[in-house]
């Protein structure tokens, strides 16, 4: 059964979600709402079948673990327009709809001679999801280049434009993550420079550029280097179900870092997000506990990267969650460090 407003939105009952999450776990949405025109949101949300129901927004399902059927309604945005809305001498403002593929936007920006997003190449997901997690990789995070987030405020039932301060961005955090039931992101505007200082001092980017023979590297070269590295390290979700890095790198006070280094001298430590803080490598902690490449049934940790929780075939979301909890518990027991998941866990508590 389905209901629709022609070309604007569509409501589908009892929709399977296996194809809408990159772990490829089975789950069913009581209602699936496809939004083709964001301005139709108020009308669509007032549909009697879903009015007042909980909402789960799914982009490509690359940052979620469905440990059970989501309650209420699952919402997907299908607006995939990209527009350069302002040109300036040294930068441009690019607007992308929530349904735009993230990597597609990165490559589009590079083709337009714009930089800034190159270190974030090949991150799975959609533009609408990127501010929620404040996606980051290889020394960059998307909040550095967000100009405005356009959203529908379910509390006031109004469309709003939020600047970066109002988005309350932090490490893998934002107001959208802190208040998941309030805002529905419909588009994002990016402030992208024509030229900016390239971030090369992270995770082998310089070495990869050297292998590529890119002596005078530009933003497009950095993007290709990142793509090469990610393709070597991270399994393709179409081949092996996963959501990329499953665990956050722990941020700890400097005093706790020093105490850990006194006991584990080879423990790698990176600068934190704030003074008096350091960042540990969750991958290192997990590998030291012997989990890299380990599996129980079809739930496991990738052989190539210890941060990546994988579904080898038919693991359920609940089985993947239980396995991830075992990993986190072993790290806590050995290092007294608490690991937290990057993806949002639906249908169960972490």
From Swiss-Prot:
The gene is murB. Its EC number is 1.3.1.98. Pathway: Cell wall biogenesis; peptidoglycan biosynthesis. Residues 24-195 form the FAD-binding PCMH-type domain. Keywords: Cell cycle, Cell division, Cell shape, Cell wall biogenesis/degradation, Cytoplasm, FAD, Flavoprotein, NADP, Oxidoreductase, Peptidoglycan synthesis. Cell wall formation. This is UDP-N-acetylenolpyruvoylglucosamine reductase. Belongs to the MurB family. It holds the Pfam family FAD_binding_4. SUPFAM superfamilies: FAD-binding/transporter-associated domain-like (SSF56176), Uridine diphospho-N-Acetylenolpyruvylglucosamine reductase, MurB, C-terminal domain (SSF56194). GO terms for molecular function: FAD binding; flavin adenine dinucleotide binding; UDP-N-acetylmuramate dehydrogenase activity. It catalyses: UDP-N-acetyl-alpha-D-muramate + NADP(+) = UDP-N-acetyl-3-O-(1-carboxyvinyl)-alpha-D-glucosamine + NADPH + H(+). It comes from the Bacteria. It is found in: Cytoplasm. GO terms for biological process: cell division; cell wall organization; peptidoglycan biosynthetic process; regulation of cell shape. Its cofactor is FAD. The active site is at residues 172, 245, 342. InterPro entries: FAD-bd_PCMH, FAD-bd_PCMH-like_sf, FAD-bd_PCMH_sub1, FAD-bd_PCMH_sub2, MurB, MurB_C, MurB_C_sf, Oxid_FAD_bind_N. One of its GO terms (cellular component) is cytosol.
């Amino acid at each position: 059964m389905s209901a629709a407003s022609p070309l604007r939105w569509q409501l589908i009952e009892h929709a399977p979600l296996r194809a809408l999450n990159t772990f490829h776990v089975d789950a069913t949405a009581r209602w699936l709402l496809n939004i083709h025109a964001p301005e139709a949101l108020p009308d669509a949300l007032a549909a009697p079948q879903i009015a007042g129901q909980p909402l789960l927004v799914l982009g490509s399902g690359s940052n979620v673990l469905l440990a059970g059927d989501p309650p209420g309604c699952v919402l997907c945005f299908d607006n995939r327009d990209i527009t350069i809305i302002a040109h300036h001498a040294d930068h441009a403002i690019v607007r992308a709809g929530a349904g735009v593929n993230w990597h597609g936007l990165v490559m589009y920006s590079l083709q337009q001679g714009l930089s800034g997003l190159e270190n974030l190449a090949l991150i799975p997901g959609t533009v609408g999801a990127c501010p929620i997690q404040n996606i980051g990789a290889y020394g960059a995070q998307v909040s550095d280049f967000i100009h405005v987030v356009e959203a529908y405020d379910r509390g006031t039932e109004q469309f709003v434009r939020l600047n970066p301060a109002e988005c309350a961005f932090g490490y893998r955090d934002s107001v959208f993550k802190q208040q998941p039931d309030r805002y529905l992101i419909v588009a994002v505007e990016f402030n992208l420079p024509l030229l900016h200082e390239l971030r090369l001092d992270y995770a082998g980017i310089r070495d990869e550029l050297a292998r590529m023979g890119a002596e005078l590297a530009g933003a497009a070269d950095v993007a290709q280097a990142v793509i090469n590295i990610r393709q070597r390290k991270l399994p393709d979700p179409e081949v092996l179900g996963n959501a990329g890095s499953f665990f956050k790198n722990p941020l700890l006070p400097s005093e706790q870092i020093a105490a850990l280094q006194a006991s584990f001298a080879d423990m790698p430590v990176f600068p934190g997000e704030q003074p008096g803080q350091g960042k540990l490598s969750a991958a290192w902690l997990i590998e030291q506990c012997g989990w890299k490449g380990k599996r129980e049934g079809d739930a496991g940790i990738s052989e190539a990267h210890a941060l990546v929780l994988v579904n080898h075939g038919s693991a359920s979301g609940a089985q993947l969650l239980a396995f991830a909890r075992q990993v986190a518990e072993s790290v806590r027991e050995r290092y007294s460090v608490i690991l937290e998941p990057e993806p949002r866990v639906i249908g169960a508590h972490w």
